[in-house]
């Protein structure tokens, strides 16, 4: 497997030079962040991004994400032109040698948390999701925005888009996803690109919106939409584990058995009451996920793709983009690499 690290471009306080100094680090997970959702990523912009990353001694491992326009998720008549644009972006990325694209099909919101700076007793801060707090949040107030999101909305825009989803239940969303998949995957397969859908985060309905990539059954249903290695998943163990009903190791094993794991996000979370959870340090003892067993599965199934430490705590006085500081994610990367070395040597 190839250790990689999320980088948010030139505006990211974590620099490529910082990232390169992390032991075993090989790849960068990044995107073009200023092209409006739904428009084609120009090939020259992709070339510039690639040159910037490679000048640091690293390479682009994965594009995360090429956002999916809401009109595609809503099944609106405009979706065909938007899907054409999406396909052209896939082709442009492939032409620059980029072969893995992470994306999601979450309506309106990307990953959602209720507190970006929950303080642990040791003074570190982390992202958390409190189920009871979430029930009191009103997304229509226009103030809800998180660091991982591709779009932010005014009150009027939010009200309109939430109203639009009133007629879209889970089955309708599945229909719209299937339409999208059957358009893009043959094109991705033809140019050697592996698509990797990210699970919903958290993997259950919030704010009355449908969520469909949520657990074992949905993974199996998803891969059956189109039979191709290019129609794969991002195995984000922290997202799947956020629902206490999910057995994340069972989901992981099944996804590997199906040969559809195209990218891995490895972060730990600590389950709380109901569906509440806190993001934790990566080592198993701090969370609810046995990270050793996750890495063991990666080795057992010969996973050679990119893996990245996911959200980290803010430690040692660091400030910046919540969840995406340098220090704790660097610790996570070295921990994961240590687990991998141990697994490989134990298997000999």
Swiss-Prot record:
Its cofactor is Fe(2+); Mn(2+). It catalyses: D-mannonate = 2-dehydro-3-deoxy-D-gluconate + H2O. InterPro entries: Man_deHydtase, Xyl_isomerase-like_sf. The keyword Lyase applies. Its EC number is 4.2.1.8. It holds the Pfam family UxuA. GO terms for molecular function: ferrous iron binding; manganese ion binding; mannonate dehydratase activity. The keyword Ribonucleoprotein does not apply. GO terms for biological process: D-glucuronate catabolic process. Pathway: Carbohydrate metabolism; pentose and glucuronate interconversion. Keywords: Iron, Lyase, Manganese. PANTHER family: MANNONATE DEHYDRATASE. Catalyzes the dehydration of D-mannonate. Belongs to the mannonate dehydratase family. This is Mannonate dehydratase.
């Amino acid at each position: 497997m190839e250790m990689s690290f999320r980088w948010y471009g030139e505006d990211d306080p974590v620099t490529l030079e910082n990232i390169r100094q992390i032991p075993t680090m090989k790849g960068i997970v990044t995107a073009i962040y200023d092209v409006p959702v739904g428009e084609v990523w120009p090939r020259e912009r992709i070339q510039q991004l690639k040159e910037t990353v490679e000048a640091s001694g690293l390479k682009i491992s994965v594009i995360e994400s090429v956002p999916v326009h809401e009109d595609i998720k809503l099944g609106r008549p405009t979706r065909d032109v938007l899907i054409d644009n999406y396909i052209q972006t896939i082709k442009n990325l492939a032409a620059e040698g980029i072969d893995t694209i992470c994306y999601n099909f979450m309506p309106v919101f990307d990953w959602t948390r209720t507190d970006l700076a929950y303080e642990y007793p040791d003074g570190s801060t982390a992202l958390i999701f409190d189920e009871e707090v979430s029930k009191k949040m009103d997304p229509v107030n226009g103030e809800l925005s998180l660091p991982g999101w591709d779009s932010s909305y005014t009150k009027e825009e939010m009200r309109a888009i939430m109203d639009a989803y009133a007629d879209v239940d889970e089955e309708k969303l599945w229909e719209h996803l299937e339409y999208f998949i059957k358009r893009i995957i043959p094109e991705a397969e033809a140019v050697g690109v592996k698509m990797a859908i990210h699970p919903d985060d958290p993997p259950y309905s919030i704010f009355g919106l449908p969520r469909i990539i949520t657990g074992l059954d949905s993974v199996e249903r998803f891969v059956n939409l189109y039979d191709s290695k290019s129609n794969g998943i991002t195995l984000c163990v922290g997202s799947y584990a956020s629902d206490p009903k999910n057995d994340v190791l069972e989901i992981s094993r099944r996804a590997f058995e199906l040969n559809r794991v195209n990218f891995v996000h490895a972060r730990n979370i600590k389950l709380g009451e109901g569906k509440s959870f806190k993001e934790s340090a990566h080592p198993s003892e701090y969370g609810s996920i046995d990270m050793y067993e996750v890495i063991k599965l990666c080795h057992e199934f010969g996973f050679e793709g990119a893996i990245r430490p996911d959200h980290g705590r803010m430690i040692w006085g660091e400030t910046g983009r919540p969840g995406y500081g340098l220090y704790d994610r660097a610790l996570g990367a070295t921990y994961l690499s240590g687990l991998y070395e141990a697994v490989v040597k134990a298997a000999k």
